[in-house]
Regions:
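FAD-site-proximal beta/loop scaffold in flavoenzymes
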Residues: 2-24, 100, 107-184, 283
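A short alpha-helix-loop-beta-strand transition element characteristic
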Residues: 23-24, 132-136, 192-203, 228-232
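A conserved FAD-binding loop/helix module that cradles the flavin
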Residues: 141, 155-218, 303-319
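Rossmann-like dinucleotide-binding cores of NAD(P)H-dependent redox enzymes
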Residues: 27-29, 35-91, 173-178, 195-196, ...
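Flexible, glycine-rich terminal cap/loop adjacent to redox cofactors
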Residues: 209-215, 223-319
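Residues that mark the start of a beta-strand
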Residues: 16, 26-27, 50, 228
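Hydrophobic Val/Ile/Leu positions in short beta-strands of Rossmann-like dinucleotide-binding domains
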Residues: 6, 30-31
């Protein structure tokens, strides 16, 4: 059925953009509320389309905890996006071109549909070989990116990777992880013998006027892996309120009970939220506690940050 597309390559994006410029396309439905789906929502809003987002889960952006994804949902609703949560697509209808999307809860008019429901490893060609695959089809590699067959390497979204915090293998389909692993695999093919130091699932997204970032473990992951943990949420500003145009930042911190070792962090704000996640990523990578990061010598100047940065306000509030 024409008018139903996936967004996988640059060519896909160019084609869809030109298609969406047609005046008869007024209603766009996005299926999937992850990173790609949300970016599509914003793109079509900028093109003046009426946008509907259908998500099978009870919220969007599930890599973030509920408090943060809730802020993203509020931002989308404020810009006129129709959110259809807890709904599953049943079928697309139309003659030649899509005209309607049917879910388990209703029917919606649509002249264009984008399916953005995540990715899975395309490794079917390895079935029946000696290369070990995980349950989701991802290639299992050691920390040198070597598969179960000696001297055969793999890297990218087709693989599991070592998670720095949990010490377990994880499926993290992120460009940063793929680039690092690809570089390391190439070096090891040439005899470098280097090990991947581990990923944290650090990621960021722009949601209209908000920016959001996360790193390390979310609350659900901390519980899943058996951590004894605590959380705290603070609201601060990107720079001091006495300097013009301060904007609010919300930070959620997940840390180990007792030791106060930082396990994960998430941030949301209009400006300056995402880059603060990089500070937390370095801290988690090196096993820092909230006390240590809370007293780290970060920069101060009124245009950029306060004497106590939002990162440190969160850390020092952790008990």
């Amino acid at each position: 059925l024409m008018g139903v597309h996936v967004l996988k390559t640059m060519e896909d994006g160019i084609f869809i953009r030109e298609l969406a410029k047609q005046p008869e396309i007024k209603n766009v439905t996005i299926v999937g509320g992850g990173y790609i789906g949300i970016e599509c929502v914003e793109a079509f809003l900028h093109l003046g389309k009426k946008v509907r987002l259908i998500e099978a889960a009870d919220r969007i952006l599930t890599p973030f905890d509920e408090e943060l994804s809730g802020l993203a949902q509020e931002e989308l609703l404020a810009h006129g996006v129709e959110l259809c949560l807890n709904e599953k697509v049943v079928k697309f209808s139309g003659t030649d071109y899509v005209q309607e999307v049917e879910t388990d809860k209703g029917r919606y008019q649509a002249e264009l549909v984008i399916i953005a429901v995540g990715v899975k490893p395309s490794t079917e060609f390895l079935n029946g070989t000696n290369i070990k695959l995980a349950k989701n089809g991802a290639i299992m590699v050691n920390r040198r990116l070597e598969t179960s067959i000696p001297d055969v390497y793999a890297a990218g979204d087709c693989c599991l990777v070592y998670h720095r915090e949990t010490g377990k293998d994880a499926f993290l389909a992120l460009g940063t992880v793929a680039n690092k692993c690809g570089r390391l695999a190439g070096a090891n093919i040439c005899g470098a013998g280097q090990e991947f130091t581990g990923a944290l699932g650090s990621a960021a997204i722009k949601v209209l006027n908000l920016e959001m970032g996360r790193t390390g473990l979310g609350e659900k992951q901390a519980e899943q892996f058996g951590y004894s943990y605590r959380t705290i949420i603070i609201r601060a500003y990107d720079h001091p309120a006495y300097y013009p145009n301060p904007t609010p930042i919300t930070i959620k911190l997940i840390y180990e009970r007792g030791s106060r070792r930082i396990l994960g962090a998430q941030a949301c704000g209009n400006k300056g939220a995402v880059m603060r996640i990089d500070i937390f990523a370095v801290a988690i990578h090196n096993g820092m506690t909230t006390q240590e990061l809370g007293m780290t010598d970060l920069v101060y100047a009124p245009p950029f940050a306060g004497v106590w940065d939002a990162v440190q306000i969160a850390c020092n509030a952790a008990k």
